[in-house]
Amino acid sequence: MHNLQMSFTNGNTMSEFSMEEKMILVQHAIKKYENEEKLIEKLTSVLSEKDIQRNIDTLIGTQKVRRIGPEVLQNNESHTEMPELPENLKSIIDNL
């Protein structure tokens, strides 16, 4: 656990995040950047493109996110609530 906490302050690699954390990161990044290309560009600093795409597909499939237009993603907040952003992920989203 100590190593995981240290790694958040010293830079992240994709394997350090749980599946749930990856999903939360992607969902909050969508709120910040609705343009899919920009979103992927920003998130590749902390997640692999494969993880980003997989989480976008899962969020769309579970109707937590919807695609509006060819390159725009939007959280479907009328369908589901946004997950709370854990403390350890706030700085990551803030710095995207």
Task: Show the residue positions of the predicted features.
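Long, low-complexity, charged/polar intrinsically disordered regions in eukaryotic proteins
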Residues: M1-S15, I92-N95
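Minor-groove-contacting beta-hairpin "wing" of winged helix-turn-helix DNA-binding domains
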Residues: E71-E77
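Short, amphipathic alpha-helical interaction segments positioned at domain boundaries
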Residues: H79-L96
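A short, conserved structural fragment
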Residues: I60-E71
